[in-house]
Amino acid sequence: MLSAVIVAVLGAWGAWQRRWMSDDGLIVLRTVRNLLAGNGPVFNAGERVEANTSVLWQYLIYLGALLTPARLETIALWLALSFTTAALAIAAFATSRLYRTPGLVFLPVGGLIYISLPPARDFATSGLEWGLCLLWIAVLWALLIRWVGMRGTAKAGRSTYWLAFWAGLSWLVRPELALYGGLVGLVVLIAADNWKKRGWVFAAAVPLPLAYQIFRMGYYGLLVPQTAVAKSASDAAWGSGWDYVTDLFGPYTLWVGLLLAAVSAGLAL
């Protein structure tokens, strides 16, 4: 527990030092302002264009604006910072529960490596949904660990359906997170021992994202957010992907930290 709190505090402090608002973050806030003005979830009044990739992020800011008179920039900053901080704590605590061994000191190396990267601290705020994405991943990890531990017990059903529900939210957090949510959902379906339980898994995971998808197709006339169309998200760009990898590992010599972490983990186990 202490190590989880420490990594979360360090992450929050580092993110606060580099707090800012990006241009894309201002696009989100414009959509929220149109919602508040009664124009609907659009970038320009009268034009049905879904300008934001994350559905949940814009509506969380909208909810914050309904509950507090604070500026939208302030709401977005504190939401993102809070989500990032919570994600670091939840992920570290969940992992510590997975490796509870007498005499073993838990050091959240993954979280420490992550917050040591300047881009991680930059985009902990920025007005974008990255903090929400981290929180979703962290909670998914925690629920997955709980689900594995609860299998065969009286509480197994409840943990299964909560995991399925959370996995289903992936499409609303960011469309590409459905890769992870779908994989977890597939594992849960395979693990279910009868079709009745599989039906309940579908009932927990599918209705909310399906309802929004129907709204999206009817209101915007698209299967995906407009950002996916504008950026040709259906294309494969392996060269650009490799450029991202080298740009991440090269400037920060990240491979050294990961190698040391792997060696330390191997020695500890």
Question: Model features per residue range: what roles?
Answer:
Residues 1-269:
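Membrane-proximal envelope and lipid/glycan-remodeling enzymes
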